[in-house]
Structure formats: C-alpha cells, structure tokens
Amino acid sequence: MLFSSINFIYYFLPALLLCYYISPKQFKNYILLIFSLVFYSWGEPIYVFLMIFSAAFNYSMGNEILTYQQSQKNPKPTLIFTVIVNIFILSFFKYYGFATDIVNTVFRTDFHTTPLPLPIGISFYTFQALSYIFDIYNHKVTKHNRFIEFILYLSLFPQLIAGPIVQYKDVENQLRYRTVDMQDFGYGAERFIIGLSKKVLLANTLGSFHNMVIKMPESSQSTAAVWIGIICFTFQIYFDFSGYSDMAIGLGRMFGFHFKENFNYPYISKSVTEFWRRWHISLGSWFREYLYIPMGGNRVSPLRHIFNLLVVWSLTGLWHGANYNFILWGLYFGILLILEKYFLFRILDKISNKIRVCLTFVTVVISWVFFSSETATEAFSYLGKMFFFKGIPFANADAHYIFASSILIIMISAVCSTPLVSQAFEMLKSKKAIFANFILLILMILSTASLIYTSYNPFLYFRF
C-alpha cells in the first residue's frame, strides 16, 4: 500500500486515526503496531513474518549485548554474529541473483536462480535494526526496552517502506511517552498534503515525460530529447522521494513522532559535498556514523581516506540495488567527493555561487543516468546521446514536441526545488492563514483527482 493511494488516504488512515485516538494511552502502541503490520501485509503477506523475525532476533541480541556489558563480559562476538545474520538476510533477498550472475560471469558457470521478490523496505528496517545494535554496543542505548517498543520502532508504517532511516536513540522516549496537540496534528496534516502533491502532481507528471523519452525509438532520441528526459527524471526522483519523506514526517507527527528531515533543497547545492549533506540525509548519516567514522573517516592518511570514501560510496550504491549501475553511481559520487576534497575546492572557491550551483546541478543530472537505466550498457548509451557520441541530431520534431509539452512542469519544478515556495507559503500562513489552508485544500483535491483519473503512480524508492 502506498501513501499516495486512495485506499490509504480515505480508508486506512481514517480508520487508524479513529482507533488510535479513542483508545486508552496504554493501548496506543499496540494499535499502531497492528495497523503497521496490516499496512505491510497489504503488499507483503508472507514477508511480514520476516520483519517480525528481524525484530525478535535483533531485540534478543540487543538485550544480550546489554547483559554482557552490565556483567563486564565482552559483547563483541555477539555484535559480530548479529551483524552477520542481518547482512546475510539482506544479501540473500537483495543480492542473491546478482551474486549468482557475477559467479557465472567470472567462472563461466551456468547456475540458474529463481528470482526472489524483494521484501518491501528490507533495506530500511535492516539498517534501523543495525543502528540499534551498534548504539547499544557503543553505550548510546543503555536500558532494556520492552519488545512492543522495539518492534514498533522497526515496523512503524510512516517510515517503514522508504524512510527516513530513524535511529532508536532519537525516538526512544517518543516510543514510551509522547503527546499530540492540535498544532502537531495540523502540522502533520500539512506536511502530508504537501508531500502528496509533490509526489502526485509533480513527480508523476515529470515521470510520464521521462518515460516518453525512454520509450522513443532510438532513431528519434535526439540529444535535446535525452537531456529533457533526464532533467525530468532529476526532478521526478527528488519530488518522488522527498514527497514520500514529507508524508512520512507528517504522518509521524500526527501520532506524536518527530522524525528528522531527510531533504534540504539539494538542488541548490554549490558542490557535490554539499549535495550529499542535503540529499537523503538519514542514509548519509547512517553510513557516516556506522561505517565511515569507524573506518577512520578523514583522520587518516590521504590514501586511506580515499580508500574509505571509495568503500563507503560503493556500498552506498549497492544499498540502492543489486545492479552494476548502482555501484557505478556510488563510485561516481565517491570519485567526485575525492576530487573536491583534494583538488576541485581550490578552483570552486574562485567561482561565483550561481555558477557553482549550475555546475553541481549538471553533475547530479549526469549521475541520474546510471540510476534510471536498467543496465550499464544502457546508461553509457544514454550518456553517449547526451554528449553527441552516437552520431544523432541535436534536435528533431519529437524533441520540439517534448520540450513544448514539458517546459512548464520543468520550470515549476525548478522553482519548487528551492526554498522560495516554502518561504512564501510560511509568510502567507503567518499573515493570512485561511488562504494558506485554502491552498492546501486545493492541493488535496487536485491530488485526489489525479489519483482517481490517472493510472501512472509509481514510487521510485519502493524497490529499495
């Protein structure tokens, strides 16, 4: 079940809100847990048991590590065992087929595999479970917790499918003691509507234009057309994912949870380094805290620092999917970050901020070619068309049509990807709140109409 669906908005969510707010305080976590499991089971009736196993296993291992620490015993073997089991489960479902393909290629074997459906949200809830284990080991979580609190932490439906990746220490108190006032609920509803409209009105529209370019006969894919297509995808993935994060943050606030922001206008970044401080913040924080810093971070020799960055970014790419494209995508950013650290910043510091923003944006646009393509061959072919290496025309009639059809939504998206719209809306709220609420109502009506009358409603991060 997606947040951007009629079933969720007009059936599931009202039923949950009613049950949650009429139930006594001591039952609220149980209500949330039941509905979260139903939410997950809607699309994964079998794999819900895998998530429950993950919760039970990591909860028991966390308690064992705590017990060892309190009795002055060495908990490291338990930590290593727990990490191995989590990584094995994630790898089995996510990378089994990819690993078999690599073995077949390297050793010229012919092993056949039956494709396994990927459990929804497994990358997210596995990373949350690991952060809980690491935080216990590092004495950042120091008390035994009730199982209901831990399984709710892993399965809580707002952030279950697509994040943000929540650390236990950030919501530990909220799982036990939380309150919701009208201001919290109103803010949550506002964030949900804004996220829904970003997803449905912007991302879905942009995605239809990107699909139009992808499905063109190759002879019709001019340089201008493929640039328009990947620019549409660039804004699509931002509004798709940030819109879902907005909805998750808003839903969490309706039930008293304060999740951290996951995006901070990444397309206004003046460098790739800054971009990754603004894009998918919770994932970047996870890798930095639990992998990059333990490896030594930047407090090591330049060669070791470069090695650390390449490892972290290879794994960041691999986290997104079992495909060479994602590894290349991660390495692309890793190499750019290394170049910025040791060379490019000296040049960038001499360039105006506006030019830096444009250069960074183009750099990020190029990266999405790897992300949006099915294979590495397809990605490099697309890049060849972008940079005139394929002997195709710069523009043709199809390119003119797509440009004329998409230019308005691209311009709207460009403005909405900056703080300008948010600042204007906040100013309107402070002076004429009724008009701001009217805008939210219109956005909700338009989003609902779009969901009813159009069938194109993908979610790009759903597969991770």
Feature map (PLM): residue ranges:
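Membrane-embedded transmembrane alpha-helical bundles that form the catalytic cores
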Residues: 1-417, 423-463
